Amino acid sequence: CALAARTGRPLLFLCDSERSATQTMEDLSALLGGGVSLLPAREITFYQDVAASREVAYRRIEAMRKVLSGDARAIVAPADALLHRMMPREAFNRNTISLRVGDVTPIDQLIERLLAAGYTREYMVEGKGQFSVRGGIIDVYPADALSAVRIEFFDDELDSIRAVDVMSQRSQGNM
């Protein structure tokens, strides 16, 4: 898209339905070779399906992260998606946790940041938005990630970050 390249900003495509937005996203991804995200609409129901609403929230967070990081060339959304406000950039950046091997971060401080960002502490990580703690090891399943990660500490120094299979709870290799 020449317009996106000229402005340096992602394009926003509005569609009349979620189905149309999904199809448009797939078509644009094929045309542009990737870099297209779907911003889903929140479902408004009288009963709350917690799992479904969390998944939509995670997909909205992923789309926002891609826009703010410059990874999105285009965003496709049903018009209903724009009826709900997004988190302000400052709040999003404040709740984003970036870690690298060698960082010095007290484990307790990381746990507090995860809780403040809306993660739930569990015995075992099974899904997005969860984390668990065992000694100097923290497993986290980020909202916008394809898999969980295992963060190992030696005292307060981050020693390794590895992908984790949530089914077996085994680490799969360094990231």
Placement of each model-derived feature along the sequence:
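ASCE RecA-like P-loop NTPase motor cores
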Residues: 1-175
